[in-house]
Structure formats: structure tokens, C-alpha cells
């Protein structure tokens, strides 16, 4: 088995792809003509987005929608960078909301937390040495 995708269910797939492309520099890989699913080239694991309407057809018992008006889910997308301060501010300029400022952890790694335009938690960090 291989971990292949992280799929976030979002209000607007096209806006979310545009946000992540602007915030991270990732390129769009694919999107459906209907705009209900799309993928970004983000490294070894594909970062994908599907519409809330598609989620409703996939999950007959319902699902929890992410929202900026609620606390973030207990899961995050983590992106490593050697230019954390620059990339953290780039994401904010693209529309991310700062959740926790960049700090240096006791083990030497720098870490900061953001929320994306849908309320999902993003960690921007330096690689662990």
C-alpha cells in the first residue's frame, strides 16, 4: 500500500486551488470541468480538493465541514521549507490566517501555523535535521 492523496472537501475547488498555488507555488495538475475536484503537484503525495457537494454523495452518514468560524480539526497539512519566514508571509499575503507565529522548537526546528481559506490547519516548518 502507498499513501497517495490527501483530499480536502471545500466550498469552492477553483478558489482553493488558486489559494494554494499562490501561497505555496504548487502547480495545478488536474481539475474536472465541473469544478468539483482538482489536484496540485505538491511532491510525492498529491494534494487534492473535492467539493462539499461531492462529499455529500460520498458519505451517506454526513461529514464535518471545515470552517474558519470553528476551531480547526485535529489534523494539519505540513509543508517544509528552508525559507520559513518568507514562505509564511507569502501564505498570509495569499489569504491564509495566522494561527500561531513562527517559533523555534527546543529541537531546533522552526514551526508556524496558519489556517487556509476553508479553515484547514497548515503547518509551515523547516525540515527536522
Please describe what each predicted stretch is.
Residues 16, 20-21, 91, 119:
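Conserved active-site tyrosine of GNAT-family acetyltransferases
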Residues 117-123:
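Short, contiguous alpha-helical
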Residues 1-5, 27-82, 88-115, 126-129:
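Vicinal oxygen chelate
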Residues 10-12, 106:
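Conserved beta-strand-loop-alpha-helix junction that forms the acyl-donor binding cleft
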Residues 13, 84-85:
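Residues at or immediately preceding the N-termini of alpha-helices
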Amino acid at each position: 500500500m502507498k499513501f497517495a492523496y490527501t483530499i480536502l472537501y471545500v466550498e469552492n475547488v477553483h478558489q482553493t486551488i488558486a489559494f494554494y498555488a499562490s501561497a505555496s507555488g504548487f502547480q495545478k495538475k488536474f481539475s474536472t470541468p465541473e469544478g468539483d475536484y482538482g489536484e496540485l503537484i505538491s511532491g510525492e503525495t498529491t494534494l487534492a480538493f473535492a467539493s462539499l457537494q461531492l462529499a455529500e454523495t460520498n458519505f451517506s452518514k454526513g461529514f464535518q465541514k471545515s470552517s474558519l468560524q470553528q476551531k480547526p480539526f485535529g489534523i494539519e497539512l505540513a509543508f517544509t521549507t528552508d525559507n520559513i519566514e518568507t514562505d509564511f508571509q507569502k501564505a498570509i499575503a495569499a489569504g491564509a490566517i495566522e494561527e500561531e507565529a513562527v517559533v523555534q522548537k527546543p529541537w531546533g526546528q522552526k514551526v508556524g501555523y496558519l489556517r487556509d481559506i476553508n479553515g484547514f490547519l497548515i503547518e509551515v516548518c523547516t525540515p527536522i535535521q
